[in-house]
Amino acid sequence: MKKFNDWLEKHNLRNIPTLIVVVAFVLFVFMTIAFLNHNDEDSSTIYITEDAELRTGPSAAYPEIHSIDKGQNFHKIGKTGKWIEVVSSNNKEKGWVAGWHTNLNIQADKNPNAKPLKDKTIVLDPGHGGSDQGASSNTHKKSKEKVYTLKTAKELKALLEKEGATVSMTRESDTYVTLDDRNIKGDAYISIHNDSLKSSKANGSTVYWFKDNQKALAETLSASLQKKALLTNKGARQENFQVLRQTNVPAVLLELGYISNPTDEDMITEKLHRHIVEQAIVEGLRAYFSE
């Protein structure tokens, strides 16, 4: 006790008002430091620490809504991987921003050249085949769906293998495979088709999913197709297809254009355009497995 009294005497703190001022100052310094260092991921308000982009979904594959400037703040409403779902203070705009552009101290991937598809098993299912030709066009080309789903799958397989993925195919030639036999396990399952209607006006691509664990893959691939491909994008939709229903892995069914539409048919049958679509699928898979 004597030592404490001596310490108070030495620092002239026996005066109660002086002691109160010192304590208040210490508390102020402590609270200021705590505020400046605050980066709790559970905080409802986030701050943009460098110029960034607000996107429609949780990856760079999703379309950009608009750019956002350093210093802006948003309310945090969700989080997927390293991406934060935000809404503006006036609730007028909503989207996703990369966490490494915020005060949440989320680190960007250290190696941007890493291959997220390395050692992943991707199942490619070229629709139809053999006696089941699928849809066909009414133009002079008389294009058959089974031919171009297989071409697309083979070309896509080569691109995915360059990314380090292992690719399994439900068919590799013009053979008929039952829907039950198409149920092959992998890290992702992609069934490839072309759409068709009696009307030649219908056009565009659609990505279908059925189970909850398939939705994120569908939305990511749809966003990548919208960003890269020339086909009209109809988005990601839920549908009870058997190939999606019978598997427990993330799976999608891609309708890559209407073979009944002459413009879409040209894009389906031209290798250069197929390559653009295939590259969009690869980029979508990269984005999906990066999260």
UniProtKB/Swiss-Prot annotation:
Alphabetical GO biological process terms: cell wall organization; peptidoglycan catabolic process
One term of GO molecular function: N-acetylmuramoyl-L-alanine amidase activity
Superkingdom of origin: Bacteria
UniProt signal peptide: 1-40
EC number: 3.5.1.-
Localisation: Secreted
Enzyme class of the recorded protein, top EC level: hydrolase
Region (Disordered): 109-146
Free-text function comment from the UniProt entry: Probably involved in cell-wall metabolism.
Family per similarity comment: Belongs to the N-acetylmuramoyl-L-alanine amidase 3 family.
Protein name: Probable cell wall amidase LytH
Organism lineage: Bacteria, Bacillati, Bacillota, Bacilli, Bacillales
Gene name, Swiss-Prot/TrEMBL: lytH
